[in-house]
From Swiss-Prot:
The gene is btuC. PANTHER family: ABC TRANSPORTER PERMEASE PROTEIN MJ0876-RELATED (PTHR30472:SF25), FERRIC ENTEROBACTIN TRANSPORT SYSTEM PERMEASE PROTEIN (PTHR30472). The complex is composed of two ATP-binding proteins (BtuD), two transmembrane proteins (BtuC) and a solute-binding protein (BtuF). GO terms for cellular component: plasma membrane. One of its GO terms (molecular function) is transmembrane transporter activity. Belongs to the binding-protein-dependent transport system permease family. FecCD subfamily. Required for corrinoid utilization. Probably part of the ABC transporter complex BtuCDF involved in cobalamin (vitamin B12) import. Probably involved in the translocation of the substrate across the membrane. It is a multi-pass membrane protein. The chain crosses the membrane at residues 9-29, 62-82, 102-122, 130-150, 152-172, 187-207, 229-249, 283-303, 316-336, 341-361. This is Cobalamin import system permease protein BtuC.
Length: 369
């Protein structure tokens, strides 16, 4: 137990250092280059290194196409924040434009990676990812409907995507459940069927979207463009709380790897644990895709690669996957921002992830031979 805890701390610390380094370097890159020192001071000023602080819970109206929907968020009121004398232009660029996008990217990447790690263990299949239970396709239907039919779906893009993701995930679960038992194979096949159906609905909406096809396609490809602090305030609490719950069930996930019968023998309530893991992973993924769109490969490639390095122990795998996923998505978005056309980050993750994943598969096959 102590050895596993020590490994988790060591690997998490290393991944945390990597994440911070990627965040800082990413903030220096853009049309207006800014030095690393200025970025660090601007970040400290924006995040306000405080003498004191108070935290309050409130509801925030998420920006929508039409109408509005209250969304729980946290407000941190700082007392006497320290100032670092950063030029006003640099402070605006870093604090208002780059940092919200970078922090949201890290949040989304972490949520997709930790959900992917959980679902790969859940299905005992390294090819599983958050989209396998219909979360991404459900979010796509909700978001595209809100974009193309704002007079019908009046709650807006992010709330519609979040609701669509959860409805799809729990529909998959309801279809696969019989007499209180949910076979993993049935759940997997139900997810594929629902995902295919929702993909057809999304395609129909896009084909008939007219002038709204561009924003719909951008959302479907995944983008962090235009991210602001209120997006971070809405997404971060959901991801943090959900990730904490998943980490608390790391031991049960380790036991489930041995098989459901062995897990029963060792005192794990298998059906209850599976329901909880699926629900929380779906909520965490929904919070991510509702703000960033359908970004692929993060939840597939990151936990798979991390597992090859740190092993299958979820006490180590989950935190390291989350931190590495955040770093990976921020790095991919930095590449997107550095190009002249600034493509959606989902294109970059696919270009990076697909060849790397094929390499991993080929490498494993060669070793097996």
């Amino acid at each position: 137990m102590r050895e596993a805890s020590a490994r988790a701390v060591a690997w998490s610390a290393a991944a945390g250092v990597l994440l911070v380094a990627v965040l800082l370097v990413s903030a220096t890159i853009g049309p207006e280059p800014i030095t690393l020192r200025t970025v660090a001071m601007a970040a400290l000023t924006e995040l306000a290194v405080p003498v004191g602080a108070s935290v309050t819970m409130h509801t925030h109206a998420v920006p929508v196409v039409s109408g509005g929907l209250p969304w729980p968020a946290l407000t941190i009121a700082y007392a006497a924040p320290l100032q670092f004398g950063v030029p006003e232009t640099a402070q605006v660029i870093v604090g208002t434009i780059r940092l919200p996008r970078i922090v949201l990217g890290a949040t989304v990447g972490a949520s997709l990676a930790i959900s992917g790690a959980v679902l790969q263990g859940f299905f005992r299949n390294p090819m599983a990812d958050p989209s396998i239970v219909g979360v991404s396709s459900g979010a796509a239907v909700g978001a595209v409907a809100a974009i193309t039919l704002p007079s019908v779906v009046v709650i807006g893009v992010q709330p519609a995507a979040f609701a669509g993701a959860l409805i799809a995930a729990f529909t998959v679960y309801a279809i696969a459940t019989k007499n209180g038992h949910t076979p993993t194979a049935t759940l997997l096949l139900s997810g594929v069927a629902v995902q295919t159906l929702l993909g057809a609905v999304t395609s129909f909406l896009v084909v008939n979207s007219g002038r709204e096809i561009r924003p719909a396609m951008y959302w479907l490809m995944g983008t962090l463009h235009g991210s602001r602090w209120h997006d971070v305030e809405a997404a971060l609490p959901v991801v943090v709380v959900g990730s904490a719950v998943l980490l608390a069930y790391a031991r049960e996930m380790n036991v489930l790897l041995a098989g459901e019968e062995d897990a029963h023998t060792l005192g794990v309530d298998v059906d209850r644990t599976k329901r909880l893991l699926l629900a929380v992973a779906s909520v965490v993924t929904a919070a991510a895709v509702s703000f960033a769109g359908a970004i692929g490969f993060v939840g597939l490639i990151v936990p798979h690669a991390v597992r090859l390095v740190v092993g299958p122990d979820h006490r180590v795998l989950l935190p390291v996957s989350a931190l590495t996923g955040g770093a990976f998505l921020v790095a991919a978005d930095t590449v997107a921002r550095a190009t002249a056309t600034e493509p959606p980050v989902g294109i970059i993750t696919a270009l990076i992830g697909a060849p790397f994943f094929l390499y991993l598969l080929r490498d494993r096959e060669v070793r097996a031979l």
